[in-house]
């Protein structure tokens, strides 16, 4: 078993699920279990400044060259999504995949099928890592952590490879949008960085959604149902009216590429009050602004029908499209593309239909595009990752480092 696979399996077994309702940093104490392990492993690899700061793990591999090679950062996040259990992950290796259904869990008859996930057929003959069907896998983003750590281990074992300063960081709470909240850009010390938090092999991303969350509070009036005629106002039914007035063709399930959406991801309520939790996503700034305006205007429209105060919308921006911060330093994307091509990986440059720590870090002065990890179907029981893609990710990281050293050696 290659070292990147061994590392990933160890990291995946540690529960690091984040919690959006917590106000601490990190949002869950269990993320520190992985943080402490990574700090220790970085120190064992010779990164003597390895440290945990505000729940973030930082470390620096000093340059072994006197040339003016830029300091390059590599970043991954420790937490897993709160959308699905990350407790007691039991990863399974499927060797020499034959293109058929994979039985994840005989007891619950859970199957990972190419009929549902046709991308599986791209990996016939390869080794896959899957879940046992009861948890997510955590390749998002423990695969990225394993790939960065393996690359650092390779560099420390091969001091003959010339490189500049290499900065690594592992962040908490990326899955709940707080991964960059306490990130110490100045202390990190990189001129630019890459998050290793993408999907399938070859993905290279420097555009992402503009993102906001919207909380819609709907007020009703509860009265005993036995004498409720012309008195009761059921907030659940009012909330449903709001939901169905948003464009049904503009949801995650009906959009792709550069198309934006409204996503209702939680509802909590009763007759007296119902709360709708939305996320709003779009690539273009004008379209993004229009979506926010649509939600506010819809609340006004509903209030005109039912009376002032029944509907209230609160919108909070979360992150912006990093494209405007990456374009002035496109050499970092070009170098990653060349690195992939050099190691035999076809680059797939595409927009991120989501966000990474890099999107916010780019606006904090650290331009940070995103590299693939190799994983698929994040945030659920059908998550999987081909082992060869993880190995290629390590090669790409090392090649980026090598290319910058070569460029500044001439």
Curated annotation (Swiss-Prot):
Annotated binding of Zn(2+) 1, by residue: 77, 140, 197
Record GO terms (molecular function): metallopeptidase activity; tripeptide aminopeptidase activity; zinc ion binding
Localization in the cell: Cytoplasm
Cofactor descriptive note: Binds 2 Zn(2+) ions per subunit.
Keyword Transport found: no
Catalytic residues identified in the record: 79, 174 (proton acceptor)
Record carries keyword rRNA processing: no
A Pfam entry, by short name: M20_dimer
Broad class of enzyme this protein falls into: hydrolase
Residues at which Zn(2+) 2 binds: 140, 175, 379
UniProt xrefs under InterPro entries: ArgE/DapE_CS, Bact_exopeptidase_dim_dom, Peptidase_M20, Peptidase_M20_dimer, Peptidase_M20B
Alphabetical list of CDD domains matching this protein: M20_peptT
Record's keyword terms, sorted: Aminopeptidase, Cytoplasm, Hydrolase, Metal-binding, Metalloprotease, Protease, Zinc
Function: Cleaves the N-terminal amino acid of tripeptides.
HAMAP family cross-referenced by the UniProt entry: Aminopeptidase_M20
UniProt-listed PANTHER family: PEPTIDASE T (PTHR42994:SF1)
The name this protein goes by in its record: Peptidase T
Source species of the chain: Desulfitobacterium hafniense (strain DSM 10664 / DCB-2)
